[in-house]
Amino acid sequence: MQSVQCFGKKGNATAVAHCKVGKGLIKVNGAPLSLVQPEILRMKVYEPILVAGADKFAGVDIRVRVSGGGHVSQIYAIRQAISKAIVAYYQKFVDEHSKAELKKALITYDRTLLVADPRRMEPKKFGGHGARARQQKSYR
């Protein structure tokens, strides 16, 4: 059984993608890609497919499980997991040249498709409304 497992992360959201030989199905939490919510961000999930070309995804099935974070971070985690999974699949079961070509196309379009965003939320501290913001002080 030819399959690879990759993950994508953004904020607190984690998406795990299983990529195996199939007939071009891509499912997120058991539902097809066309049902991803919110609708405005649906094209963000389609980006790896549009950039790489639908022909690259024709022979594989990708199942994605996503949890944690909010709507936007989950969308970014999903697209990263899909991109990383297809690159890993091409490296393992197809030739190295097409993998390098695919990786180059994805990175030129958007680096976050393959490289995780290291930014994390800074915890709030006392004496203010946020992590750095302080309450206003009066001297007289």
Curated annotation (Swiss-Prot):
Subcellular location: Cytoplasm
Pfam families, alphabetized: Ribosomal_S9
GO CC annotation: cytosol; cytosolic small ribosomal subunit
An example Gene Ontology molecular-function term: structural constituent of ribosome
GO biological process, one term: cytoplasmic translation
Keyword Lipid biosynthesis in annotation: no
Record keywords, A-Z: Cytoplasm, Ribonucleoprotein, Ribosomal protein
UniProt main location, coarse: cytoplasm
Key word Nucleus present: no
Stated family: Belongs to the universal ribosomal protein uS9 family.
NCBIfam families according to UniProt: PRK00474.1
Additional remark text: There are 2 genes for uS9 in S.pombe.
Subunit-level organization: Component of the small ribosomal subunit (SSU). Mature yeast ribosomes consist of a small (40S) and a large (60S) subunit. The 40S small subunit contains 1 molecule of ribosomal RNA (18S rRNA) and at least 33 different proteins. The large 60S subunit contains 3 rRNA molecules (25S, 5.8S and 5S rRNA) and at least 46 different proteins.
Role played: Component of the ribosome, a large ribonucleoprotein complex responsible for the synthesis of proteins in the cell. The small ribosomal subunit (SSU) binds messenger RNAs (mRNAs) and translates the encoded message by selecting cognate aminoacyl-transfer RNA (tRNA) molecules. The large subunit (LSU) contains the ribosomal catalytic site termed the peptidyl transferase center (PTC), which catalyzes the formation of peptide bonds, thereby polymerizing the amino acids delivered by tRNAs into a polypeptide chain.
Protein name: Small ribosomal subunit protein uS9B
The species this protein was found in: Schizosaccharomyces pombe (strain 972 / ATCC 24843) (Fission yeast)
